[in-house]
Every structure is written in C-alpha cells, then in structure tokens.
C-alpha cells in the first residue's frame, strides 16, 4: 500500500512539472486583505473577534514551516514541543498554561481541533504542513464553545476546501541531506460542476535523522510518515452542503534519541557501581562528536490514526443549521530507550488503543446584525485501553541485592554485547501498567452577542456538561523476588 501511494505521488508530481509555465503577472497593488476566521464557530472577520487570535494563512505555504510545531515562530505566547514516547505527540503551552500528556485519562488543557473534530489526546496532532488552509491560535479559556478541558486555548486547524469548479494538481518534492524526501500531492476534481467535487491528498515524509547510532551502525531519530485520504463535497442547492472527510496517517518515525554525553576519561566513567560502567556510553570515542549515540534501542514507533468527519450545513434566511459527526481511531505502539547507552538498563514499551466518537448539532442566528447567537448540543464518547511495560535492570538488581544496589556482590559478565549471565531470572521486565477507560459526555451550550454600538458589544455564554468516566487500572511488579 505504501509503495502504491508513493508511486501515485511521484506520478502526480511529474504531471505538475510538465504543465505549461504561465507568464508571471505584474505585482498587484498593496492591499490589506480581510482575514476570515471561525474561532467562534462562525465565519467572521478576525478584527471582529473579541478574543486574542492569531490566524496563520498564506504564510504557511511561503514559509519554512514543516510541521505544526514550527508555527510557534509566528504566534506569540505559543510554545510547541514534541512529546517523547507519544506518536507525533505535542506538548503545547499557551500563555504559560502547559499541556503535557502522561496518559490519556484526561483531555489536554490546550485543545486541538481539525475541521470541527476535537482531538481528545495529544497523540497524532503534530501534522505536517500539508493540505492546510489556515491555523488559528485561540488564547485563553475556550470552554463555552469548545468545552472539554480547554482552559489554556485552542489550535484550530482548517484543511483546504474542496473545489467544485476547477481541476487542479498541486504537488511538491523536497529532497535534502540525511535522506530527506518529502512528496506531497493534492488533486482536485469537480465531478459535477458547482454540485459535486472530490479532493484526494497524499504525503510521504522520510528522513534518516541527524544522529548516528554507532552501536546499531545507522542513523537514528528519523521520520517515516504516510498521510493520505479524500474529501467529498456535495452542494445540491444554495442551501444544503454535505462534506465527507476521511484520512489515514501511518507514523513509523523514531521518537527521538537520548544521547549519553559521558566519554572515557571523564569522572562519570571512572566510577563503577556494580562491577561495570553504569552506562556503556563510556565506551564511545571522545572524538565521535555530539551527533552520535551508542544505544541498543531504536525508540521505534508503529502508529496508525484514522479519522472520519461528516459535516452538514443547511443555510436559511434566518438560521444556519450545522451537524458534525466525527470518529477517530488510534492504534499506537512505541518503545523508548531511556538510558541512551548500549546496555539494556531502562526502557518502556507503550501500547495504546483509543477511539473517540462525537456528534455536534448547533444553530447560528442570521436574522439580525444587532443580536446574534450560537446554541447547540454536543455528545462525546471515548474508549481507551493502555498497556505499558517497564524494563528496569537497576530495579531487578536492587531486588537481588547486587553490588552498590544491595549487599555488595560483584556483578560480572555483563557487557554491551551480552546479557547478565548466571542470574536467576529470564527477563528484565520490572512492572506493567494497564488500564481501560470509557468516557461518556453530553453538553448544551450557547453564546450570545448583543452589538450595542459599533464600539461596544455585550457577550454572554454558558455551557452545561454532564460527564461520566469508568476507569479500571493497576500496576503490577514482576521479575525476580529473592
């Protein structure tokens, strides 16, 4: 499947490169273009929105932004970092309110919304700069309209619209050092002009990584992602609009690497706690440089994110009725090697299954310019299962009473190419953390704007939520117990 998708991407790219080159038009006169946003779940000028909003539009295609985290250079008070151990996971901070996900029991305080679908976990939110029309950064609490736990703000991501009038192929190829190869394609096909249109998109992102693993003899910390899907838009008349969006993202990227900075001759490498170096990074050559690592782990990931969004809009003279159905299914498998050495000391395996389903129905008034409101109901369900294995050799040694960890025994026969011999256990598995959770939530919300004058607007809003979480979990220690 991946080979077929990449072949189609390359074909679309070649097709685009063979299009006739059009003469460059003269530069247009300088004008201030109105920016329309949907920060309050309705289209309005960004100048009329009574909140702190940054909209990033044309800058996306013209900038060096590769992934969502790069937009922090364009939006004040926004910081986005990658979360180790979480596939395409994000640690987002807005105005000092941070959202760092340790597990998925609670929704993040910084919400991410894609085409009206609230992403209830930070996994898979670091999208590449591909098929995105606009990103809105909403600062401050957004609980009235977006609900959940959005006390810090929202990243509102809007995909490019489906064209009903023009056939187009937009493709790009980026190559670079360290095996970088990005292929992206968006194809627009009007099936029935002004009535029915289809958009097909696909992207392949590959990069070997900037760090070289001398133990595994290959580069580490690279990207390997495939994102593809389609959007179908049907507008049978001027009032009714139906849009179906479906996409799949496969992420097999390595979740970064832990570099051990100890080298032979330094103090940390002259101390042996239990008869061997506490980490075998001490065996690396001091001249290897800061871009090398000697680790037995690959920090691999094998994650799939499948999303479906169905949106219906019915536009009348006085009201706009909107219904949004969304479903997101995630299957994550990640491994993290925390010691950064060739010794198998501390690592974790993460297995997560997540499925969310939501229904939203809302009404937006259009009968008055002085008085406007949005009211709706929101239903949300999540099924989540977690299974984490912790492999901790230090823990096992402490249970055995070995060396500095116990009664002073000497541990021998352990090196970078072999496991400990002669000890009475079969695995360094120390503990297992398993849990399941089911969440059911329903909410009713409304937001009212009363435009008293051109300079003064009175805004009021409320949200009532009833939520139930059923949780079952525990932690079990395993291994050798003397």
Predicted regions and their residues:
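Residue-level signature of outer-membrane beta-barrel architecture
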Residues: 114-116, 175, 189-191, 232-235, ...
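Acidic, small-polar-rich N-terminal luminal/periplasmic segments of exported/outer-membrane proteins
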Residues: 30-166
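Transmembrane beta-barrel architecture of outer-membrane proteins
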Residues: 63, 89, 109, 152, ...
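Outer-membrane beta-barrel domain signature, strongest for Gram-negative TonB-dependent receptors
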Residues: 217, 223-374, 380-386
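Solvent-exposed loop segments that connect transmembrane elements
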Residues: 211-219, 256-294, 337-347, 389-434, ...
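Transmembrane beta-barrel domains of outer membrane proteins
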Residues: 71, 138, 158, 184-190, ...
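Outer-membrane beta-barrel translocator/receptor signature
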Residues: 107-109, 121, 130-139, 144-214, ...
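Transmembrane beta-barrel strands of outer-membrane/channel proteins
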Residues: 171-175, 200-206, 244-248, 325-327, ...
């Amino acid at each position: 499947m991946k080979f077929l998708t990449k072949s189609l991407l390359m074909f679309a790219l070649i097709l685009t490169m063979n299009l006739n080159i059009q003469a460059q038009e003269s530069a247009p006169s300088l004008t201030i273009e109105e920016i329309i946003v949907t920060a309050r779940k309705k289209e309005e000028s960004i100048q009329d929105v009574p909140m702190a909003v940054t909209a990033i539009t044309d800058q996306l295609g013209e900038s060096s932004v590769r992934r969502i985290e790069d937009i922090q250079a364009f939006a004040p008070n926004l910081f986005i970092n990658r979360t180790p151990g979480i596939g395409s996971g994000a640690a987002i901070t807005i105005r000092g309110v941070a959202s760092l996900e340790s597990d998925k029991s609670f929704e993040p305080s910084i919400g991410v919304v894609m085409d009206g679908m609230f992403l209830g976990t930070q996994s898979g939110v670091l999208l590449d700069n591909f098929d995105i029309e606009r990103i809105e950064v909403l600062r401050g609490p957004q609980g009235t309209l977006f609900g959940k736990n959005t006390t810090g703000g929202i990243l509102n991501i809007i995909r490019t619209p489906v064209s009903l009038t023009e056939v187009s192929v937009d493709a790009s190829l980026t190559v670079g050092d360290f095996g970088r190869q990005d292929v992206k394609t968006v194809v627009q096909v009007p099936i029935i002009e002004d009535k029915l249109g289809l958009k097909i998109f696909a992207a392949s992102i590959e990069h070997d990584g900037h760090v070289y693993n001398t133990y595994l003899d290959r580069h580490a910390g690279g990207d390997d992602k495939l994102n593809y899907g389609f959007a179908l838009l049907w507008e049978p008349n001027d009032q009714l609009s139906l849009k179906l969006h479906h996409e799949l993202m496969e992420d097999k990227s390595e979740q970064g690497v832990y570099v051990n900075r100890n080298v032979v001759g330094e103090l940390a490498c002259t101390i042996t706690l239990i008869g061997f170096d506490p980490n075998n990074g001490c065996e690396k050559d001091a001249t290897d440089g800061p871009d090398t690592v000697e680790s037995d782990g690959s920090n691999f990931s094998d994650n799939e994110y499948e999303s479906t969004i169905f949106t219906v809009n019915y536009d009348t003279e006085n009201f706009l009725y909107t219904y949004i159905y969304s479903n997101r299914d995630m299957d994550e498998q990640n491994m993290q090697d925390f010691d950064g050495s060739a010794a198998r000391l501390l690592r974790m395996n993460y297995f997560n299954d997540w499925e969310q389903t939501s229904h939203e129905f809302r009404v937006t008034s259009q009968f008055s310019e002085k008085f406007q409101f949005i009211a709706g109901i929101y239903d949300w369900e999540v099924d989540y299962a977690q299974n984490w294995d912790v492999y901790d050799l230090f823990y096992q040694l402490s249970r055995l009473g070995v060396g500095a960890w116990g009664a002073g025994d000497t541990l021998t026969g352990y090196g970078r190419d072999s496991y400990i011999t002669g000890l009475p256990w079969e695995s360094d598995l120390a503990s297992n953390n398993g849990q399941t959770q089911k969440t059911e939530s329903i909410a009713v919300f409304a937001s009212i704007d009363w435009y008293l004058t051109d300079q003064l607007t009175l805004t009021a809003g409320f949200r009532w939520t009833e939520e139930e979480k059923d949780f079952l979990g525990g932690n079990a220690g395993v291994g050798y117990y003397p």
